[in-house]
Amino acid sequence: HKNHIVLTCDDPANPFLVALRLSDGKELWRVSRKDICERSWGTPLIHESDGTTQVVVNGWPWVVSYDLKTGEELWKINDGGDNPIPSPFVANGWIYVISAHGGKSPIYVVRPEARGDITPSLDAPSNDGVVWSTLKGGSYMSTPVVYGDYIYLGHYSTIRCFNATTGEEAFIEKLPQPASIIASLVAADGKIYAASEHESVHVLSAGPDFNPIANNPMGEPIFATPAISEGVIYFRTTQSLVAIH
């Protein structure tokens, strides 16, 4: 981002976040994440808003946002899923952070201008920094997708759907078996696509009701997130690349 590359290096013994100058690799800053993060797998989010560019890192036991220029901590949230994999993303001008492991599966929706410890609770799921949150509803491997008014999450064989603005639950339903969602969900043309490691692609009609409309056999497992470009959806299976109009 603007001649910066940011790397998350969350080795449990010596975790750190480092920013390098993209043009020559010079280290611009480095911050220790000791006692901040033991595990983190997702790609950091870089988001620019109101003159501040922040780096949001999903992690456990803390989700933390840093100032891209200095590495200074901006805001943090404690105690999500203990093996966070989904990458943070922006929709509706807010930052969505999701995890699900170790008995916890939160969704946090954060205002970019948040500062300090903004950890929500069961009794107070929103605050000055958090638009809404739920302690049960996140996904383990798959990064969700916001499409229209709703956020869709693939968690193993379950599809979860919430109103993306209010957090109101729309549905939590099982896909036709077998199904296990590793890849991130994608959406286009009024449809949600959930690629399964059980050699199929489940297609749902977008909206607040659970409406599966197809289960397409692919012949091979799918672990990679589908890509959509110029009216074509691309699926990378374990052995093939498939393009469908």
Predicted features, each with a name:
Residues 1, 10-14, 30-52, 58-60, ...:
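Extracytoplasmic beta-rich repeat domains
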Residues 13, 61-63, 102-103, 157-159, ...:
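Loop/turn residues immediately N-terminal
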Residues 134-206:
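Loop/turn-rich, solvent-exposed surfaces of beta-rich toroidal or solenoidal domains
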Residues 21-24, 67-71, 111-115, 163-167, ...:
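Short loop/turn segments that connect beta-strands within beta-propeller blades
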